[in-house]
């Protein structure tokens, strides 16, 4: 252990030596840079950009660029970065975490690597925890960047897409972590590439990096859509399919558990739902509900595939026969079963897109962060983000007095002592900051101070604007400020007049947080830039952390010695508290790591889908090649399921292939039984694909190329988006129920990975099948609008247009059942005058 500590200590010393050497090189250019005029200094930015274009790396430019940014800060802001700030800037440029104590000027430090990395033209994101800080830093530091000829954008929640696009197009963009994540998700839901706002993710500097990458790591960002407004369509589809007759209206393929409507079944469906063509894009929802109702009624059996318990449909594992609690069938099949069994149909709000901060920030080419407290989480930063934590020495020696903890037996005794201490210090004119773990604690102390008539401010992490003002004044003479631990981060407490003589800022902690890092943040509020200060934590044996880690013995010992109201100050207790904190931190790290392992499954799937969407949206020419691959995979699956080359021909189900092709890919009768007989499985596939190719060629002639391309995009985007949202929903249910599988020797994570993969494979096949069906069967209308995909609107001519004048129908005309009726109604012949014929 001693050897390990020595190694860590020595590597830290090595880091500091290297950083000091590099910082000295920058300082050596100070006179030369100071001699440049404002114009010449600005010209340096243009020169650097050209050098990057010609192949010089940012590392090559570091010393010169930092010297220019440093001189620029002096002229534009009146601030001249210290040597330690140059060192911090180098750490950030190298994609690591600079641990710099409160008051050491992290905001100014960040300007150096931000300036350097902005020269690449790829865009730099500066990330803060709230909009107030983003706004403040963009405004204050923007003066420097503009002075040096760089553009600065501020990305806020209230901005329109156009304004966001402009903000992201700037050299440097300030934003909150939430807004960045949501913009990424929204970009992957757009239907035109022009609607995307972000550029590829290049470099981000995260302020208060521990807060964003550790404390908020487990919080997923979720964009939810409304669930289907009504469950009535499931009930209607269920009622309809129960009126159908097997063979006449639908066919069942036992092997693949698929059900197809026949031509008669389709006609009945069109009449029942009062639509012209079930395969029109506007009717995808109806067709989907019918398909699921058919599957639920004619391929799924009660007490075999599922059971009904307590008004719920529960899935039965086909291999073990166990009930799989928490799992739901995807794509609406579960709701179709609920309609079939007459139980309550559950419709939750749908998750349309989701990502965690862990996975969002790991997509950047380079990531850096700064904070006053990261050393305690060093292992996590290294394992998960591949970032090292490097401690930067302070500019001036810290002279703050950190006192050992005071421990009381009861909470009441502790709070009384806290209030007495505040009153004494307040009387001397010493500013006091009281840190609490919970809001109710801050309110309790506030009421005790009111009774004593001590004027004070209470700060909860609710109002960012007001928060900064209160914190700014917290260092004034006699000020008393009560704050929950995280409140006011990012704003310095500067000491007012006459407070140094009173002892500087006194920080009083009312209990230990379960994380040492949060305690250290509170301590670090005092003693900034070599100022005097004092910190004191008050604990009681009834505090949650003490209760969790066995303080009963000590409590009874203190009571035995008659110390119920007195405090003890013991290094042993402080060490016990710290080891308890270490245990909690370890548990929390394990839990965040586990979240990441689960989320990685969805991350890999998300990347595949988002990449496919991006290719579709950006495609300039026809998507036929992609679509033909989907059709080929679908035909391959259907043929191999019904006519496998590994089975004797007498076991083949050629009629099943014809039923599927008639229902989904080609006009009825295009392929007959005679066409398929005496052929190999491969020949059958090729025959079907040749016929489909000819039908596709014919379809392409119906519209100009750019309009047909738009039709292909509409189909692909609608199918991919619908299936992906259903899949996320199914993965959510799988994740919720997977821990229930931890029976026997089953590892829930392994199960989640393998089942998640199977579900993804099934979704991809389902996308192939639906795209093939809609491309081949949908009637192409003119003026297709991709926007209608996003809104799920009808892809029909606008309603409300005057009805076309109907033409008389002559009996001697030969008209196909699916041809448009010549009367001009716009309906199919079979649904109009064909009925009379």
UniProtKB/Swiss-Prot annotation:
It is found in: Cell membrane; Cytoplasm. Its EC number is 7.4.2.8. The keyword Plastid does not apply. It holds the Pfam family SecA_DEAD. It catalyses: ATP + H2O + cellular proteinSide 1 = ADP + phosphate + cellular proteinSide 2. Residues 791-837 are annotated as: Disordered. May bind 1 zinc ion per subunit. One of its GO terms (cellular component) is cell envelope Sec protein transport complex. Residues 800-817 have a biased composition (Basic and acidic residues). CDD domains: DEXDc_SecA (cd17928), SF2_C_secA (cd18803). It is a peripheral membrane protein. Residues 827-837 have a biased composition (Basic residues). The keyword Translocase applies. Part of the Sec protein translocase complex. Interacts with the SecYEG preprotein conducting channel. Has a central role in coupling the hydrolysis of ATP to the transfer of proteins into and across the cell membrane, serving as an ATP-driven molecular motor driving the stepwise translocation of polypeptide chains across the membrane. NCBIfam families: PRK09200.1, PRK12904.1, secA. Belongs to the SecA family. HAMAP family: SecA (MF_01382). This is Protein translocase subunit SecA 1. It comes from Listeria innocua serovar 6a (strain ATCC BAA-680 / CLIP 11262).
